[in-house]
Amino acid sequence: MLGNETKTQKGTRLIKAAFFDIDGTLLSDKTNHLIPASTKDALVQLRQHGVKCCICSGRPTAQLPWCIKDGFPGFDDAFDAYITMTGSMCYDESGVYADVPIDHEIACRFVKCVEDGMFDALLLNRNGVFCNRRSEKVRELERMVAFEYPVLDFSEALNEPVYQFCAFVSPDEEHEVSDVMSDCIITRWCDLFCDVVPSTSSKPKGIEATLKHLGLSREETIAFGDGGNDATMLAYCEIGVAMGNATDDAKASADYVTTDVDKDGIALALRHYGLID
């Protein structure tokens, strides 16, 4: 099928925007956090066919790998839009078009829990991502994402907007966070920690803001993800694709399950829908 028309059981559609999670979707843990060659080729083709390629991640800008921020040969202008911090900040080359910080009182409540020793955490603001201390759980995440978090006094950080917290609690311990942060959305993509974002923020809301900014509709979208925090995004977009290495809830929310990130998953799915040659 030519161009970016795709025909499925739901009919013929014109896909004009593709949204990609980063960890486990674009980047592989098995290849030193690099984008597989087949995915690079697929992204180049997708853009050549007129499809906007957008990032939709829990990561902040400061934690985006160079290949995501700056692009790569054949994909030199980087991505067309960046939905970061689980939808709390969205921007493109023209600037920030969506900015949703956590309410100050709610942020203070979370920091009090950290100071009381309930759990360790990360704090995400415009300047970067910081930890309250470099505990073993923090170091484990650093190894997973190839990034070292600077230590910051969270109380001092409250002088400016906070967009997301990450609480180092297991799924069984998650109630320790939800009990005191019931007015926030709590998601996770691994067992090590959960993300805490404003109730007015999410990956789908970030996509909605991006579509409005680009002048596109929800019916013109495809999304790729692998984590539990991608499930709502996969359900929201016209076509949701879960990676073969995805969590069960991500797969349940998807229209199509492709192969693993390391097994040409993105390229195979785009080819399945006729979006690349």
Model-inferred region functions:
Residues 107-109, 113-233, 245:
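Conserved acidic, metal-coordinating active-site core of Asp-based
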Residues 78, 86, 180-183, 236-237, ...:
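Short, structured coil segments at secondary-structure junctions
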Residues 37-137:
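Active-site phosphate-binding/coordination module
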Residues 50-54, 79, 162-164, 219-221, ...:
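Short active-site oxyanion
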Residues 16-31:
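Asp-based phosphoryl-transfer active-site loop
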Residues 12-17, 36, 196-277:
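Mg2+-dependent phosphoryl-transfer enzymes with acidic/Ser/Thr/Gly-rich catalytic loops
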